[in-house]
Amino acid sequence: MGLRYCRGMSNVVIPRFGELLSPYISQVPPEISPRFLALLERGAASRYRGWAEMLPEHSEVLLRCAEAEDEIANRIEAAFPMDESRRAELEAPLPGALKTYYDVFAPLDPWDQLRVQANAERQGAGAWERIASTHPDPKVIEVLNSCSELELSSADLVDALLAEHDGR
């Protein structure tokens, strides 16, 4: 199930990424699921680098978004320490999750891919906010809220690129 996005000639279905990826996220024990989400953030960073190559005239903005995704992952990894003996358990569902994520974008042109990603950033911000709302540690809550802000900042940057592109 997804949300329909209409803009000009574009008619893109925006998936609910939490629902789409829940079969993979649910395979990870709850106490390390933020670390799994951090790995997904690194996947998004890789996507942004790919878009920067496809759209070199916009690479500065897209690479800023990639850096933000990596920064989110770094902050989450620092805030949620994990015994390295759990690495295999953490990474086991990752290939399926990344394939599912990438498959959403496969049939779309780069601009529609960015439309989906801008919405995914806003969904990601909501996910960090939901985790923060139930976390007992104020310092971790601060980190989670900062991650949400980075997600929203990237969404705004991508929305500005899309507005510029659509205005042509």
How should these model regions be labeled?
Residues 2-168:
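Non-heme di-metal
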